Every structure is written in C-alpha cells, then in structure tokens.
Amino acid sequence: MAKENYVYVIGQLRKEAFVVKNKDTGRPTEGAMFLTTIRRGLYDAAGNFSPRWDKPLIRTKDPRLAKKMLEFEVNDIIEAKCCIVTHHVKKIVKCPHCETKQARESSLVYLTPVSLTLRNRPEGETAATSILMDPDVAEMSNIAHVIGRVCNEEGVKYTNDNAGHTKANYQIAVNRKFMVYGSTMDRLSTNEETQEDRADYPWVVSYGKVADDDKKQLVQGSLLYIDGYVHTQTYKQKTICDNEDCQMEFDYPCQAMQLTPYSNEYLEGCNLVESVRNLNDRVSDETMELDGE
C-alpha cells in the first residue's frame, strides 16, 4: 500500500510542555505539549470573520526533541513536521459519587514530531494570536496529507439532519512513512511498551459535498488520499461505576483527534461514479497516445 502520513502544523504554545527526565542523569527522555492551530479559511460562507481552532497533542520519545520542548516558552509560535499516531490505552477515571478509580478502554491519538522549530517568540498572547490569524500563516497552520484504506467493517457511516448538514465517519489504516522514535521500527528501542504495528488507525470525519462523495464511493477496503487537517474536540463519555455498592452513571472528559478532508482522491477499490471512470479512461488513452509518439 502506498505510504503517506504527513502532518504539518504551525501553532501557539499556550501552556509549558510536559517533559520527563531521567532520574539518574537529569536528561530529557520524552515530552508532550499542545499547540493551538488555526484552520485555513478565516471567513465563513457569509463573509464573516470566523476563525476555527484546533489543539493537537504533540508527543515524542526522542530525547533530542524532548530537550527542544524544554527550550520553548509560553506563546511561542512553533512549526512541527509530524505523523499521526494511534494507540489503545487504559484511561483512569474516578467516579464522582464514590470516588472509586477505574480503568476504561480508550484510543490515544496524537502527532509525533520528526522536527520542531521555533518560528516566532512574540510578546504576549495577543501578539501570538495575531501571527496565527495572518492569512498566509493560517493557510498552512494545520495541514494533513494521508493515504489510508477504509478498515472498519461497516464502512462509511453517513448522517443527514435534513437541514443540509451531512457527515461521514469511517476509520482508515495508514502505513507509517516516518520512523516513530521508540517503536519497533527503531532498532535502538528496547522498551517493551513501544512494541507496536507499523500502521495507525485514525478516524476520518468529512462534511458536506465531501461526505456525499465518500458515501457514494467508499466501502471497506477502499484506498484514498486525504488532503485535509487534524480536527480536535472535547466531549463527555458516559459510563457506569464498577463499584458494586455504587453502580451510578457518570460522565468523564475525553479528547478526540480526527482527520477532516478538504478533498479526497479515490485511488483503489472505490465505487467510482461514471464521470470519474470516463476521466480515468480519457487520461489513460491520452497517456497511451503520448507513449506511442
């Protein structure tokens, strides 16, 4: 399968990075931080100024990049070249009624950086926000180029609220293009917790015309190229307390990171509509004629 798992972000650091250090040497070993990014297209369909923000988690086990995180200051504007990574984890939650701690299965989705660069060090939060709202910066503040294959059994889940708002959800399998430091692809790694597959499984959420096209063309096994951005959101998840003496329902906070396409290219195993088939045939014929000259 073709490989493309590339995410590029320019974002504002609004809170100091969390960096873990070796107890014996004091040297950084891993780090994490949130960057506030802005989506391209600062105006809505009515022409009103309407910036939209996302806050992806950046996480690394590369000591070199963890050390860089220590050097960053609040409000710094940082460039990060990354790939999207997914892990199954156990999230510890606490019942607000009986205060019992308990584990819940969860999916951790984050960006692991290949490079981190300080772009600007503005004077204060207002100046930092102004930099991000520069149209030239917003155009490239949150870019995701990913090739993946639809892997969930039910394929595309499509919803329409009958008010013109359509949405499609599906999961894709993405082969890693970059080496994730500390993974099985990193031959220097000996940490058992990092033994992982060479693919990641993010969810995709598309809207409007893209969602309509996804519904028509995608099935389980379809291969597509996504030109879009990483979309983050927070939500509440309901659960029942494990404590037999309690068993009360409660909510706990969750964070999600998904891919949202500006456009999709349907590559393989898709239900291509007739117009696309005709275009492919025409391109193929023209190529054959050129080859024959």
Task: Enumerate the predicted regions with their spans.
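Short, structured motif recognition centered on aromatic/hydrophobic residues
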Residues: 34-36, 78-80, 144-147, 169-172, ...
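Short, surface-exposed polybasic/aromatic micro-patch for ligand or macromolecular engagement
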Residues: 53
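C-terminal end of P-loop GTPase domains and the immediately downstream helical coupling element
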Residues: 30-32
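Short, contiguous, well-structured surface segments enriched in hydrophobic/aromatic residues
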Residues: 39, 173-176
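Short, structured beta-strand/loop micro-motifs enriched in basic residues and often containing a Trp
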Residues: 56-63, 202-209
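Flexible glycine-rich surface loops and low-complexity tracts that mediate binding to linear polymers
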Residues: 75-90, 222-235
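Acidic, gly/ser/pro-rich intrinsically disordered tails
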Residues: 1-10, 14-28, 43-50, 67-70, ...
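The Walker A/P-loop phosphate-binding site
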Residues: 199
